[in-house]
């Protein structure tokens, strides 16, 4: 298994003066400790139903991270494509690819928070179709000159975006999530989402998906690829999963959870009850968290992307000791690949 971490781009109160230096030190520390990648989240507005905080703009942040690292992949999980204009996005992606030496991963999705779509003149009901158009147009702009595109939402004539040729892998998010009143989506893998995932280079399972739901989604992905005459192995397809975690060194689950509740509810909204958090996120003692990681590997996850909930390098070192070191190179079951 590969392990990446999210840069601490949360806009926490009182952190304005130190934030840039925190991100720099965190990125450099993650590289030194051997993490495979640095990821960022995209929310144009504060999605108050799920989170207490907003985040820095992701692509600008990754350009900053590119300047202070040399090895880790740099990715989005996810970039909300319906809020992006494809010509501008192509220029941003091409620039990050140039500045990072080709380390960018475009983790993409439709988003879910309706005020964000409305703020840019869109609507939630258009998000799937807009996502497909943005992906198609952006990838064409990254590979060809003098591009003309006629879509329902985006159109341009004879556009050339340079530098050309630095096309990143595209990992598409979506699928089932916990069946609960606090979840923003239904617990299904929609056929349109399934087809979108299988068109590209990888899949990011929802952070709110339990291991059995990841397993079920992946079986559908495998079947869809087989119907198309291919497989994950043939495509070099990546199975990733995003999750939230605070590692506690306290003895006993109750003590560990008490610490985690305080830390997690500084970032995520308590509109989701703790039983929801425990059902989908990595909580409990270090041994509990390790069992949760193994359950996700057993479900087919190859690349785990973890939010550390903090810029504190001590958490990053705990992640390296208790997750990166014991699970690096651990593969999903052979019958799942």
Roles of regions detected by a PLM:
Residues 1-337:
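Active-site-adjacent structural elements that line small-molecule/cofactor binding pockets in enzymes
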């Amino acid at each position: 298994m590969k392990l990446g971490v999210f840069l601490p781009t949360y806009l926490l109160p009182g952190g304005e003066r130190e934030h840039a230096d925190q991100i720099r030190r965190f990125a450099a520390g993650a590289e030194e400790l051997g993490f495979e990648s640095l990821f960022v989240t995209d929310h144009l507005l504060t999605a108050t139903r799920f989170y207490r905080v907003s985040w820095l703009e992701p692509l600008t942040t990754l350009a900053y991270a590119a300047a202070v690292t040399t090895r880790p992949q740099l990715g989005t999980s996810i970039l909300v494509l319906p809020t992006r204009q494809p010509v501008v996005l192509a220029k941003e992606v091409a620039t990050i690819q140039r500045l990072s030496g080709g380390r960018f991963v475009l983790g993409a999705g439709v988003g879910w928070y309706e005020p964000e779509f409305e703020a840019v003149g869109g609507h939630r009901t258009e998000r799937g179709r807009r996502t497909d158009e943005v992906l198609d147009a952006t990838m064409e702009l990254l590979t060809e000159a003098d591009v003309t595109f006629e879509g329902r939402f985006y159109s341009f004539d004879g556009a050339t975006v340079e530098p050309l040729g630095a096309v990143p892998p595209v990992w598409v998010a979506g699928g089932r999530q916990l069946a609960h009143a606090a979840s923003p989506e239904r617990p299904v893998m929609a056929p349109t989402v399934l087809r979108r995932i299988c068109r590209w280079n990888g899949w990011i399972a929802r952070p709110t998906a339990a291991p059995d739901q990841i397993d079920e989604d992946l079986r559908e992905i495998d079947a869809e690829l087989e119907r198309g005459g291919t497989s994950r192995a043939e495509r070099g397809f990546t199975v990733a999963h995003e999750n939230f975690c605070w590692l506690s060194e306290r003895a006993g689950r109750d003590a560990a959870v008490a610490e985690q509740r305080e830390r997690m509810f500084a970032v995520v909204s308590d509109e989701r009850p703790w039983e929801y958090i425990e059902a989908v996120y990595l909580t409990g003692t270090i041994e509990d968290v390790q069992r949760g990681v193994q359950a996700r590997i057993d479900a087919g996850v190859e690349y785990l992307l973890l939010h550390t909930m903090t810029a504190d390098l001590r958490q990053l070192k705990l992640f390296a000791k208790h997750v990166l070191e014991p699970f690096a190179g651990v593969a999903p079951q052979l019958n799942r690949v």
